[in-house]
Amino acid sequence: MKKLREIRTKIDAYIQTHKPAAFIMWLLVLLFPLWLSLSGNAISFLSGEDGAAVLLCTLLTENYGAFLLGMLLIYLFFGAMVCLWKHVPPAALLTGLIFTIMPTVDFLKTEILKEHFLPWDMLLAKNADSFTTFLSALKIPTPLWWLWGGTVAYLAVLAILRPTLPIAWKKRVLGAPILLGCLYLCTMNGTVRADYSLLGLSSEAPTDQTKNYTENGFLTAFVLNLSSLNMGDPDNYSERYLEKAFAQYQPDEASGADFQNPDVIVILSESFWDPTTLKNVSFTEDPIPNYRRILAENHGGSMVSCTFGGGTVRPEFEILTGMTTSMLPSGNVPYQQYVFNNIYSYAREFKNQGYDTIGIHTYQKEFYERDRAYPLLGFDEMLGEYDLHAEQHFNSGPFLTDESLVEEIMYQLEQPHEKGVFIQGITMENHGLYLNKFDPSEWNIDFTSDTLSEEESNLLHNYCKGVSDSDAQLGRLYEYVMNREKPTVVLWYGDHLPTLGNDFGVYASTGTITSTTAANWTEEEKYQMFSTPYVVFSNYDTGHEYRADGTPV
């Protein structure tokens, strides 16, 4: 330590007596936010289909207004921290951590869920440990290590040089709140945001997050989303208006005296989809034979999901409430952003009729704040992976199996319920990431294709293993329900298609889609990429004719 202090004393003395050295030191301080802006955008762009270098060059040459805004925000924050601390190294450390971690989270989230890091995702910080399972299967690209290393090296140099702001404390105390105030005005003030147009930006909430983050860079895109945090009431919105709108949907007549309330089960099957719809792939056997067998005797077909590859919470919310998320900001998480009071849902409707209402998820119930939101939707209980009464099975990949969910549903159905029970189940077994998810010895569905790479074949093999396991449990639940004495109705549906490689890898390689840019898809391709299977079955004659005509609903 003594030797280190001597070295630092010599460095300080050299800088004080040599103006060029002092100039270089302060130039490094001045350029630090520029480095963070460049490296942060590069980290975020690592998940882009055109490559980080191309996207960064485009940002600097064509969308430089967006780059300048993001860089300005970092300068304002860094300047405020330097004023507070006086010493540059701790201010640089805090600034570096924030503006390196945030784009890194954006990259990781995009790789895992195919959704960018949005302002309301800050509410998920308490569930950060939930992502550790995904991270273990994620391959960190080499450029990310270099970018992290560059920031660490920059911080190390500043720590050695130890620049100190040569300004009296009174001016520093005044400067910090002024800079933070400017930061607030630049990000949150409506008048200032309206002037974003001077930089070639729109102050309106983005509708296409991929385009937003690709064209504007991470930090500017993140800030543009801040306008979506609060939504005003639509015109003519009132309780009276809603009562009038819903009046036409009231039932014409009540059920007969001999009507027996059925138990109702709704199961969101993670990434449940029919892989045989891929072009130029021949399967040796059907991955979902039980679904097809049940569908042939019951009602079902294809439904159009509101999301692809991730964002389970949105189709889940839509099915539970009957409300669309398409009018909400892109990338929304309804439970976190909008569910703060009791709202209508089918769970509440059944609860009002005397049913017990139970939510079951074979993962952490705190994720997406389901544990807080479900009671507001009318659920009596929300059970997570640690609350299950049935045996937990981890014999298929890193997540609890669908077998665990089906056994818990059976357990709940066997419990006494005065009138009936409504169960919402959410599976987890077939969640991505799919690369190397299972040992090849566990693959149970084979196929041939001349267009898939080795990695893409690995992805598809692992997905087929998972979806066939899900299908097996659908068949098991079907047999249980059909042999049950009490009337029971089941809805089983897939929430979205799986993510099978970067840039829609498997889908593009097989020719299922003709472009890796979603905006260029044909109407037929859009249906293909957003349509998931569903089936409705019951163990009694409902007495109602099914209305769907087989087209996606």
What are these regions (language model features)?
Residues A247-P262, V266-S269, D274-V553:
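Solvent-exposed soluble domains appended to multi-pass membrane proteins
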Residues T187-V266:
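Membrane-interface segments at or immediately adjacent to transmembrane helices
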Residues T95-I98, A125, N216, V406, ...:
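Short amphipathic alpha-helical surface patches that serve as generic macromolecular interface elements
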Residues L113, W120-M122, T207-F218, C306-G310, ...:
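Membrane-interface micro-motifs in multi-pass membrane enzymes
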Residues Y14, T104, F131, N225, ...:
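Residues that form generic nucleotide/phosphate-binding pockets
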Residues T95, P119-M122, N216-A221, H461-D471:
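Short, well-ordered coil↔helix boundary/capping segments
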Residues M122-A125, E215-L219, E239, I288, ...:
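Alpha-helix initiation and N-capping motif
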Residues K2-T210:
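Transmembrane and membrane-interface helices of multi-pass
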